[in-house]
């Protein structure tokens, strides 16, 4: 078995060592990746690739993996340079920025390391929306908010989605008057229709009860909010319980859509709808999550 061990510490060159055996090879490399997402933190990542190839084919796999990592970091940088989520939903991204992001999306999609993403364990988890195409439902919903209300009155700060056990829960975080926070939650059911294709059926929409940030409330509104709070306390218990649990809207049988997963790894998810419009999502890490990415290639 041929063993290739490449170490890339910081700015040093890649070092490869080959054994003389011509049997199927194990390909292992340690790659410190500079995370260029929104946190801008530098972390060390270990990447292991198991390759059933001869010694002559292994460097090609190494080169392809380096190309994929480079394309991924390039996309994250392009998203940041385009102004991020806020610039996208407010329509502040330029045509040049949009075409640049779309070009990098296409470059990364062709290097997709997951052949059957719809059934991959990597698909499940909590994802943050980073990019919508011009016809995306998420972008249309966001622009409705900004067109109806100026940014000083309403602000969509973040959109995320939790995918687990063939169910999805998308959450939009909204802030009103910079002092009242609320969430719009859209629940849906996912049905696998192929290695790349899924059907999403919307089940329920919910508007959570707003939370007031008292220290951020403008002086001219404190009296009105105080009166509203007093009025709510005087409502019957049944109505108060209903308001506390949020306003729920049944959606079963009303809306559905089809989409395909064009790229999936441990950090990035790219989907396209029936019009080919891309959405880019990045995984939301928890404090206990690891920084180890394991990818296997079989040939």
From Swiss-Prot:
Residues 1-48 form a transit peptide. PANTHER family: PLASTID-LIPID-ASSOCIATED PROTEIN 4, CHLOROPLASTIC-RELATED (PTHR31906). It is found in: Plastid, Chloroplast, Plastoglobule. GO terms for cellular component: chloroplast; chloroplast stroma; chloroplast thylakoid; cytosol; plastoglobule; thylakoid. This is Probable plastid-lipid-associated protein 13, chloroplastic. The gene is PAP13. InterPro entries: PAP, PAP/fibrillin_dom. Its main location: plastid. Keywords: Acetylation, Chloroplast, Plastid, Transit peptide. Belongs to the PAP/fibrillin family.
């Amino acid at each position: 078995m041929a063993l290739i061990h490449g170490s890339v510490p910081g700015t040093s060159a890649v070092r490869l060592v080959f054994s003389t055996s011509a049997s199927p090879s194990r390909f292992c490399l340690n790659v410190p990746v500079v995370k260029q997402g929104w946190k801008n933190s530098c972390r060390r990542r270990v990447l292991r690739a198991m390759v059933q190839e001869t010694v002559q084919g292994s460097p090609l796999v190494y080169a392809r993996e380096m190309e994929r990592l480079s394309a991924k970091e390039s996309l994250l940088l392009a998203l940041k340079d385009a102004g991020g989520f806020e610039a996208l939903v407010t329509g502040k991204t330029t045509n040049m920025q949009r075409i640049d992001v779309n070009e990098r999306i296409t470059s990364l999609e062709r290097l997709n390391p997951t052949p059957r993403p719809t059934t991959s364990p990597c698909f499940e988890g909590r994802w943050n929306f980073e990019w919508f195409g011009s016809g995306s439902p998420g972008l249309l919903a966001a622009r409705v908010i900004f067109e109806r209300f100026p940014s000083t009155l309403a602000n969509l700060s973040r959109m995320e989605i939790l995918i687990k056990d063939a169910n999805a829960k998308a959450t939009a975080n909204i802030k009103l008057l910079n002092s009242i926070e609320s969430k719009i939650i859209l629940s849906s059911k996912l049905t696998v229709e192929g290695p790349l294709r899924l059907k999403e059926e919307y089940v329920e929409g919910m508007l959570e009860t707003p939370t007031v940030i008292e220290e951020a409330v403008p002086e001219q509104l404190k009296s009105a909010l105080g009166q509203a709070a007093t009025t709510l306390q005087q409502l019957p218990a049944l109505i108060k319980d209903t308001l506390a649990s949020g306003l729920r809207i049944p959606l079963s049988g009303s809306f559905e859509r089809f989409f395909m997963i064009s790229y999936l790894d441990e950090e990035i998810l790219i989907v396209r709808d029936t019009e080919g419009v891309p959405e880019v999502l990045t995984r939301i890490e928890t404090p206990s999550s690891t920084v180890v990415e394991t990818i296997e290639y079989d040939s």
